[in-house]
Amino acid sequence: GVFDEFRIFSPGNKSMVLDVNGARIGVAICEDIWQDGGPVAELAKENIDLLLTMNGSPYEEGKTDTRLDLAVRRAAEVNAPMIYLNQVGGQDDLVFDGGSFVVDTNGTLLERSPMFMEDLSFFDLDTSVEHQKVGMIAAKPDPDEEVYTACVLGLKDYMAKNHFKGVCLGLSGGIDSALVAAMAADAGFVPCAEAGIRMTLRYPCPLDWW
């Protein structure tokens, strides 16, 4: 399955705390924060200044809110702000939606990157103050737009990483083939590389539907 990390990684026997210019940074990897009583519980005993978690968390509809709620719980558990970093892009049948963010100890959302695109953000976190300044918070897409953009990104990266030069579509005139054509166009295929073939059987819609 997607989360069968034992195929690639050997588990460590203790949690990691890094010292960066005097700041104690606890490090967690993806599934670590989803397990109650796991590595985060150990980090809660380490008096850390920041919890950093690196994720390859694939897109699911509604998962953005689930991640945020989980991060708020973990930040409160370790009594420190939390930075949630997430991969972005398509990998075979998976789409990673990005949307990295920062939450404060009290659950305030301090920074959020856009979804479905690479982004380089800088955020100043002062662990010596009680209330942090809020940075740039990217708006969440409309639910329908979110699903559509995930499909387009998955198609775009799959085609690019397999070195496909174009697409050939069977266009019946129905909504489904029209939507696929729109996705191909939004994925960046120029008109000369996107060929549409109108089906000549008895099922296609009349030409005046176009």
List where the protein language model places each region.
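Enzyme catalytic cores with a strong preference for nitrogen-chemistry domains
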Residues: G1-G170, D176-A195, T200, C205
